[in-house]
Amino acid sequence: MKYYLQKLIDGHDLSMVESEAAMGQILESATDAQVGAFVMGMKMKGETSDEVAGFAKGMLNVANMIRPKVDGILVDTCGTGGDRHNTINISTAAAIVAAAAGVTVAKHGNHSFTSLSGSADVFKELGVKIDLEPDLVKSSIEDIGIGFMLAPKFHPAMKRMVGPRKELAVRTMFNILGPLTNPTGAKAQVIGVFDKDLCNLMAEVLKKLGKEHVMVFHGDGMDEISTLSETFVAELKDGIISNYTLTPEELGVARAKATDIVGGTPEENAHDLLYILNGEKGAKRDIVVVNAAAAIYVAGLAISIKDAIPLAEEAIDSRKALNKLKELVEFTSGNKVDNEAFNTGQSLRNEVC
Protein backbone atom coordinates (compact mmCIF):
# COMPACT_ATOMS: atom_id res chain seq x y z
CA MET A 1 0.00 0.00 0.00
CA LYS A 2 2.90 2.34 0.72
CA TYR A 3 3.96 2.21 -2.94
CA TYR A 4 0.55 3.41 -4.13
CA LEU A 5 0.37 6.12 -1.47
CA GLN A 6 3.77 7.43 -2.53
CA LYS A 7 2.64 7.61 -6.16
CA LEU A 8 -0.34 9.73 -5.11
CA ILE A 9 1.86 11.98 -2.97
CA ASP A 10 4.09 12.50 -6.02
CA GLY A 11 1.04 13.38 -8.13
CA HIS A 12 1.25 10.36 -10.43
CA ASP A 13 -1.67 8.40 -11.84
CA LEU A 14 -1.99 4.68 -11.22
CA SER A 15 -2.34 2.24 -14.08
CA MET A 16 -5.44 0.07 -14.31
CA VAL A 17 -3.43 -2.92 -13.08
CA GLU A 18 -2.03 -0.93 -10.14
CA SER A 19 -5.50 0.35 -9.22
CA GLU A 20 -6.91 -3.17 -9.29
CA ALA A 21 -4.13 -4.35 -6.98
CA ALA A 22 -4.58 -1.36 -4.68
CA MET A 23 -8.28 -2.13 -4.31
CA GLY A 24 -7.39 -5.70 -3.45
CA GLN A 25 -5.19 -4.46 -0.61
CA ILE A 26 -7.82 -1.96 0.55
CA LEU A 27 -10.38 -4.75 0.88
CA GLU A 28 -8.06 -7.29 2.48
CA SER A 29 -5.11 -5.91 4.43
CA ALA A 30 -4.81 -2.11 4.44
CA THR A 31 -5.27 -0.28 7.74
CA ASP A 32 -8.03 2.30 8.18
CA ALA A 33 -5.38 5.04 8.17
CA GLN A 34 -3.99 3.78 4.87
CA VAL A 35 -7.47 3.53 3.37
CA GLY A 36 -8.35 7.07 4.43
CA ALA A 37 -5.07 8.46 3.10
CA PHE A 38 -5.44 6.64 -0.21
CA VAL A 39 -9.05 7.62 -0.77
CA MET A 40 -8.47 11.28 0.03
CA GLY A 41 -5.24 11.36 -1.99
CA MET A 42 -7.13 9.97 -4.96
CA LYS A 43 -9.94 12.49 -4.47
CA MET A 44 -7.52 15.43 -4.36
CA LYS A 45 -5.62 14.23 -7.44
CA GLY A 46 -8.75 13.31 -9.36
CA GLU A 47 -9.52 9.79 -10.56
CA THR A 48 -8.75 8.74 -14.13
CA SER A 49 -10.90 6.28 -16.05
CA ASP A 50 -8.10 3.69 -15.85
CA GLU A 51 -8.01 4.05 -12.08
CA VAL A 52 -11.76 3.76 -11.60
CA ALA A 53 -11.91 0.76 -13.95
CA GLY A 54 -9.13 -0.86 -11.92
CA PHE A 55 -10.95 -0.21 -8.66
CA ALA A 56 -14.11 -1.79 -10.10
CA LYS A 57 -12.15 -4.84 -11.24
CA GLY A 58 -10.62 -5.14 -7.78
CA MET A 59 -14.09 -5.18 -6.22
CA LEU A 60 -15.41 -7.71 -8.72
CA ASN A 61 -12.45 -10.01 -8.03
CA VAL A 62 -13.79 -10.66 -4.52
CA ALA A 63 -17.53 -10.34 -5.24
CA ASN A 64 -20.08 -13.15 -5.17
CA MET A 65 -20.63 -13.26 -8.93
CA ILE A 66 -23.52 -14.99 -10.70
CA ARG A 67 -23.96 -15.82 -14.39
CA PRO A 68 -27.67 -16.14 -15.23
CA LYS A 69 -28.42 -18.10 -18.41
CA VAL A 70 -30.78 -15.84 -20.35
CA ASP A 71 -31.69 -14.98 -23.91
CA GLY A 72 -30.63 -11.51 -24.91
CA ILE A 73 -28.70 -8.97 -22.88
CA LEU A 74 -28.83 -8.30 -19.14
CA VAL A 75 -29.62 -4.72 -18.11
CA ASP A 76 -29.01 -2.89 -14.81
CA THR A 77 -30.67 0.37 -13.75
CA CYS A 78 -28.46 1.14 -10.73
CA GLY A 79 -27.46 4.79 -10.24
CA THR A 80 -25.03 6.55 -7.94
CA GLY A 81 -27.64 8.20 -5.71
CA GLY A 82 -27.25 11.80 -4.69
CA ASP A 83 -30.63 13.05 -5.93
CA ARG A 84 -31.02 16.61 -4.65
CA HIS A 85 -34.78 16.67 -5.26
CA ASN A 86 -35.70 13.77 -2.92
CA THR A 87 -37.78 12.12 -5.62
CA ILE A 88 -39.72 8.88 -5.64
CA ASN A 89 -37.72 5.70 -6.34
CA ILE A 90 -37.58 6.22 -10.09
CA SER A 91 -34.98 3.64 -11.13
CA THR A 92 -36.67 0.96 -9.01
CA ALA A 93 -40.03 1.52 -10.67
CA ALA A 94 -38.34 1.78 -14.07
CA ALA A 95 -36.68 -1.61 -13.55
CA ILE A 96 -40.07 -3.25 -12.97
CA VAL A 97 -41.64 -1.55 -16.00
CA ALA A 98 -38.69 -2.46 -18.22
CA ALA A 99 -38.85 -6.09 -17.09
CA ALA A 100 -42.55 -6.15 -17.93
CA ALA A 101 -41.71 -4.82 -21.39
CA GLY A 102 -39.39 -7.75 -22.04
CA VAL A 103 -36.03 -6.55 -20.69
CA THR A 104 -34.08 -9.03 -18.55
CA VAL A 105 -33.19 -6.92 -15.51
CA ALA A 106 -30.35 -7.58 -13.08
CA LYS A 107 -31.03 -4.78 -10.60
CA HIS A 108 -28.12 -3.94 -8.29
CA GLY A 109 -28.94 -1.74 -5.29
CA ASN A 110 -28.66 -0.97 -1.63
CA HIS A 111 -30.30 0.75 1.28
CA SER A 112 -30.36 4.53 1.13
CA PHE A 113 -27.25 6.54 1.91
CA THR A 114 -28.24 9.86 0.34
CA SER A 115 -32.05 9.99 0.54
CA LEU A 116 -34.94 8.73 2.63
CA SER A 117 -35.50 5.65 0.52
CA GLY A 118 -33.13 3.47 -1.51
CA SER A 119 -34.10 0.69 -3.89
CA ALA A 120 -33.68 -1.95 -1.18
CA ASP A 121 -35.88 0.03 1.20
CA VAL A 122 -38.79 0.38 -1.20
CA PHE A 123 -38.53 -3.21 -2.46
CA LYS A 124 -38.67 -4.41 1.15
CA GLU A 125 -41.72 -2.24 1.78
CA LEU A 126 -43.39 -3.81 -1.25
CA GLY A 127 -42.85 -7.30 0.11
CA VAL A 128 -39.78 -8.33 -1.88
CA LYS A 129 -37.28 -10.42 0.09
CA ILE A 130 -34.20 -8.33 -0.61
CA ASP A 131 -31.41 -10.45 0.90
CA LEU A 132 -31.69 -13.61 -1.18
CA GLU A 133 -28.63 -15.80 -1.58
CA PRO A 134 -26.87 -15.30 -4.93
CA ASP A 135 -28.04 -18.61 -6.42
CA LEU A 136 -31.68 -17.66 -5.75
CA VAL A 137 -31.21 -14.26 -7.37
CA LYS A 138 -29.78 -16.07 -10.38
CA SER A 139 -32.92 -18.21 -10.50
CA SER A 140 -35.11 -15.13 -10.17
CA ILE A 141 -33.46 -13.52 -13.19
CA GLU A 142 -33.70 -16.73 -15.22
CA ASP A 143 -37.27 -17.63 -14.22
CA ILE A 144 -39.13 -14.30 -14.08
CA GLY A 145 -36.82 -11.91 -15.92
CA ILE A 146 -35.86 -9.71 -12.98
CA GLY A 147 -33.76 -10.09 -9.86
CA PHE A 148 -32.59 -7.76 -7.11
CA MET A 149 -29.02 -7.98 -5.84
CA LEU A 150 -28.50 -6.35 -2.45
CA ALA A 151 -24.98 -4.92 -2.61
CA PRO A 152 -23.73 -6.14 0.82
CA LYS A 153 -24.83 -9.69 -0.03
CA PHE A 154 -22.78 -9.71 -3.21
CA HIS A 155 -19.89 -7.52 -2.07
CA PRO A 156 -19.23 -8.74 1.50
CA ALA A 157 -15.65 -7.45 1.41
CA MET A 158 -17.01 -3.90 1.29
CA LYS A 159 -18.20 -4.28 4.89
CA ARG A 160 -14.76 -3.20 6.10
CA MET A 161 -15.25 0.14 4.27
CA VAL A 162 -18.33 1.19 6.26
CA GLY A 163 -16.34 2.72 9.12
CA PRO A 164 -13.80 4.67 7.03
CA ARG A 165 -16.52 6.00 4.71
CA LYS A 166 -18.61 7.24 7.63
CA GLU A 167 -15.60 8.88 9.25
CA LEU A 168 -14.51 10.62 6.04
CA ALA A 169 -18.08 11.85 5.45
CA VAL A 170 -17.31 13.18 1.95
CA ARG A 171 -18.02 11.81 -1.50
CA THR A 172 -15.21 9.58 -2.72
CA MET A 173 -14.59 7.01 -5.43
CA PHE A 174 -16.77 4.57 -3.48
CA ASN A 175 -19.83 6.70 -4.30
CA ILE A 176 -19.53 5.78 -7.98
CA LEU A 177 -18.37 2.16 -7.78
CA GLY A 178 -21.78 0.60 -7.08
CA PRO A 179 -23.12 0.97 -10.64
CA LEU A 180 -19.76 -0.22 -12.02
CA THR A 181 -19.74 -3.51 -10.10
CA ASN A 182 -22.91 -5.35 -11.07
CA PRO A 183 -22.37 -8.96 -9.90
CA THR A 184 -23.83 -10.44 -13.10
CA GLY A 185 -21.46 -8.53 -15.37
CA ALA A 186 -24.52 -7.06 -17.13
CA LYS A 187 -23.47 -5.76 -20.55
CA ALA A 188 -26.09 -3.01 -20.82
CA GLN A 189 -26.81 -0.35 -18.24
CA VAL A 190 -28.63 2.91 -17.61
CA ILE A 191 -26.81 4.87 -14.93
CA GLY A 192 -27.84 8.13 -13.36
CA VAL A 193 -25.02 10.11 -11.73
CA PHE A 194 -25.05 12.90 -9.13
CA ASP A 195 -22.78 15.21 -11.15
CA LYS A 196 -22.86 15.98 -14.87
CA ASP A 197 -19.04 15.93 -14.96
CA LEU A 198 -19.12 12.21 -14.13
CA CYS A 199 -21.06 11.21 -17.26
CA ASN A 200 -18.13 10.88 -19.64
CA LEU A 201 -15.80 9.45 -17.00
CA MET A 202 -18.30 6.70 -16.19
CA ALA A 203 -18.92 5.96 -19.87
CA GLU A 204 -15.16 5.64 -20.45
CA VAL A 205 -14.84 3.31 -17.46
CA LEU A 206 -17.71 1.13 -18.65
CA LYS A 207 -16.12 0.90 -22.09
CA LYS A 208 -12.91 -0.35 -20.45
CA LEU A 209 -14.96 -2.86 -18.47
CA GLY A 210 -16.34 -4.34 -21.70
CA LYS A 211 -19.90 -3.04 -21.63
CA GLU A 212 -21.85 -3.01 -24.89
CA HIS A 213 -24.59 -0.39 -24.60
CA VAL A 214 -24.77 2.14 -21.80
CA MET A 215 -26.48 5.46 -21.12
CA VAL A 216 -24.97 7.59 -18.34
CA PHE A 217 -26.99 10.70 -17.52
CA HIS A 218 -27.58 13.62 -15.19
CA GLY A 219 -30.64 15.82 -15.27
CA ASP A 220 -31.21 18.95 -13.22
CA GLY A 221 -29.63 17.71 -10.00
CA MET A 222 -31.00 14.19 -10.39
CA ASP A 223 -29.31 10.89 -11.08
CA GLU A 224 -32.16 10.17 -13.49
CA ILE A 225 -33.42 11.26 -16.88
CA SER A 226 -35.24 14.42 -15.86
CA THR A 227 -38.67 15.66 -16.85
CA LEU A 228 -37.96 19.00 -15.14
CA SER A 229 -35.46 20.26 -17.72
CA GLU A 230 -32.80 18.92 -20.06
CA THR A 231 -30.73 15.84 -19.32
CA PHE A 232 -27.10 15.44 -20.35
CA VAL A 233 -26.27 11.98 -21.70
CA ALA A 234 -23.05 10.11 -22.44
CA GLU A 235 -23.99 7.06 -24.48
CA LEU A 236 -21.66 4.14 -25.17
CA LYS A 237 -22.73 2.12 -28.18
CA ASP A 238 -20.65 0.04 -30.59
CA GLY A 239 -17.51 1.15 -28.78
CA ILE A 240 -18.18 4.85 -29.38
CA ILE A 241 -19.13 7.42 -26.72
CA SER A 242 -21.42 10.23 -27.85
CA ASN A 243 -22.84 13.20 -25.95
CA TYR A 244 -26.25 14.79 -26.36
CA THR A 245 -29.12 16.25 -24.37
CA LEU A 246 -32.71 15.12 -23.95
CA THR A 247 -35.66 17.37 -23.12
CA PRO A 248 -39.13 16.37 -21.90
CA GLU A 249 -40.59 17.82 -25.09
CA GLU A 250 -38.35 15.65 -27.29
CA LEU A 251 -39.53 12.60 -25.36
CA GLY A 252 -43.18 13.56 -25.65
CA VAL A 253 -43.91 14.14 -21.96
CA ALA A 254 -45.01 17.22 -20.07
CA ARG A 255 -42.38 19.33 -18.33
CA ALA A 256 -42.82 18.85 -14.57
CA LYS A 257 -42.00 20.80 -11.44
CA ALA A 258 -39.78 19.37 -8.70
CA THR A 259 -42.74 19.25 -6.32
CA ASP A 260 -44.59 16.98 -8.78
CA ILE A 261 -42.14 14.10 -8.32
CA VAL A 262 -41.12 14.46 -4.70
CA GLY A 263 -40.92 11.27 -2.69
CA GLY A 264 -40.84 10.43 0.99
CA THR A 265 -40.36 7.45 3.25
CA PRO A 266 -40.04 3.91 1.87
CA GLU A 267 -43.71 3.34 2.67
CA GLU A 268 -44.78 6.51 0.86
CA ASN A 269 -42.63 5.66 -2.14
CA ALA A 270 -44.04 2.14 -2.24
CA HIS A 271 -47.53 3.64 -2.36
CA ASP A 272 -46.50 5.91 -5.23
CA LEU A 273 -44.98 3.02 -7.15
CA LEU A 274 -48.18 1.00 -6.82
CA TYR A 275 -50.32 3.96 -7.87
CA ILE A 276 -48.18 4.29 -11.01
CA LEU A 277 -48.38 0.58 -11.81
CA ASN A 278 -52.14 0.73 -11.30
CA GLY A 279 -52.35 3.30 -14.10
CA GLU A 280 -52.39 6.64 -12.31
CA LYS A 281 -51.37 9.37 -14.77
CA GLY A 282 -49.20 12.37 -14.01
CA ALA A 283 -45.63 13.56 -13.55
CA LYS A 284 -44.53 10.60 -11.43
CA ARG A 285 -45.64 8.14 -14.10
CA ASP A 286 -44.00 10.24 -16.83
CA ILE A 287 -40.56 10.21 -15.22
CA VAL A 288 -40.77 6.46 -14.57
CA VAL A 289 -41.79 5.89 -18.20
CA VAL A 290 -38.86 7.82 -19.71
CA ASN A 291 -36.35 6.07 -17.46
CA ALA A 292 -37.86 2.66 -18.20
CA ALA A 293 -37.69 3.55 -21.90
CA ALA A 294 -33.94 4.08 -21.55
CA ALA A 295 -33.56 0.52 -20.23
CA ILE A 296 -35.73 -0.83 -23.04
CA TYR A 297 -33.58 1.04 -25.57
CA VAL A 298 -30.19 -0.20 -24.31
CA ALA A 299 -31.61 -3.73 -24.24
CA GLY A 300 -32.09 -3.45 -28.00
CA LEU A 301 -35.89 -3.67 -27.92
CA ALA A 302 -36.33 -0.23 -29.54
CA ILE A 303 -34.23 1.86 -31.94
CA SER A 304 -34.34 4.96 -29.73
CA ILE A 305 -35.45 6.01 -26.29
CA LYS A 306 -38.40 7.87 -27.85
CA ASP A 307 -39.50 4.73 -29.68
CA ALA A 308 -39.24 2.81 -26.41
CA ILE A 309 -41.69 5.08 -24.58
CA PRO A 310 -44.86 3.43 -25.99
CA LEU A 311 -43.47 0.05 -24.90
CA ALA A 312 -43.04 1.33 -21.34
CA GLU A 313 -46.52 2.85 -21.36
CA GLU A 314 -48.06 -0.36 -22.65
CA ALA A 315 -46.32 -2.36 -19.92
CA ILE A 316 -48.08 -0.19 -17.33
CA ASP A 317 -51.47 0.16 -19.02
CA SER A 318 -51.76 -3.58 -19.68
CA ARG A 319 -50.95 -4.24 -15.99
CA LYS A 320 -47.96 -6.32 -17.06
CA ALA A 321 -45.75 -4.19 -14.81
CA LEU A 322 -48.02 -4.69 -11.80
CA ASN A 323 -48.05 -8.42 -12.47
CA LYS A 324 -44.26 -8.44 -12.82
CA LEU A 325 -43.96 -6.90 -9.37
CA LYS A 326 -46.34 -9.56 -8.02
CA GLU A 327 -44.12 -12.24 -9.57
CA LEU A 328 -41.05 -10.74 -7.91
CA VAL A 329 -42.70 -10.57 -4.50
CA GLU A 330 -44.04 -14.11 -4.72
CA PHE A 331 -40.79 -15.58 -6.08
CA THR A 332 -38.59 -13.99 -3.44
CA SER A 333 -40.90 -14.34 -0.44
CA GLY A 334 -42.47 -17.70 -1.29
CA ASN A 335 -45.89 -16.28 -0.43
CA LYS A 336 -48.94 -15.19 -2.37
CA VAL A 337 -49.54 -11.46 -2.26
CA ASP A 338 -52.66 -9.62 -1.21
CA ASN A 339 -54.18 -8.54 -4.53
CA GLU A 340 -56.30 -5.90 -2.85
CA ALA A 341 -53.17 -4.28 -1.45
CA PHE A 342 -51.58 -4.26 -4.90
CA ASN A 343 -54.68 -2.81 -6.48
CA THR A 344 -55.15 -0.02 -3.93
CA GLY A 345 -51.57 1.11 -3.44
CA GLN A 346 -51.25 -0.10 0.15
CA SER A 347 -47.88 -1.10 1.59
CA LEU A 348 -47.26 -4.80 1.03
CA ARG A 349 -44.53 -5.57 3.55
CA ASN A 350 -47.05 -6.78 6.11
CA GLU A 351 -49.69 -7.82 3.60
CA VAL A 352 -48.20 -11.00 2.12
CA CYS A 353 -50.18 -14.03 3.21
From Swiss-Prot:
This protein's name: Anthranilate phosphoribosyltransferase
Positions annotated to bind Mg(2+) 2: 223-224
Metabolic or biological pathway, per its Swiss-Prot or TrEMBL entry: Amino-acid biosynthesis; L-tryptophan biosynthesis; L-tryptophan from chorismate: step 2/5
List of residues binding anthranilate 2: 165
UniProt family annotation: Belongs to the anthranilate phosphoribosyltransferase family.
Record's signal peptide: none
Enzyme Commission code(s) on record: 2.4.2.18
Gene designation: trpD
Organism: Methanococcoides burtonii (strain DSM 6242 / NBRC 107633 / OCM 468 / ACE-M)
Cofactor binding mode and count: Binds 2 magnesium ions per monomer.
Keyword check for Glycoprotein: no
